[in-house]
Amino acid sequence: MSSIAAHSAGDILRSISDIKSLDLFCSIAKGNMESEILKETKGLTRKQYYSRTRQLLKTGLIKRSKGRYYLTCLGAIVYHAQLVIQTGVNNYWKLKAIDSIQSSAEIGEHERTKLIKTIMDDSRIESILVAQR
């Protein structure tokens, strides 16, 4: 059994749960980064840097080769899921408006879909909301 098989979604989410770990993870995702550049630009102590990268490596989100960090395939999936979450957060008030309209009136499925497509301007969020019900 590989070491990654023992990790749960909770382990993975915990490894990016604080803002500095998430920032480090996103920086690696945006371009394979050299260790020295990451250490200098993220404002982490040496211990903080190494404990966070060790956790990201341990959960299988990143890998290191020739002094550079890269996302693994699992890391790419987690990064894209995080982007969807961030899009949801950025559209919080639009989502609240949809919730409010849905709860204040009985609307049919067609009207609900039309409402979502009118208010939302992100196709990923639209497809998630249309599929929900």
Q: What label would you give each PLM region?
A:
Residues E36-T41:
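A short acidic, leucine-rich amphipathic alpha-helix
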Residues C73-S103:
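Conserved segment of winged-helix/HTH DNA-binding domains
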Residues K42-K58:
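Short amphipathic alpha-helical interaction segments
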Residues L57-R68:
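A short, conserved structural fragment
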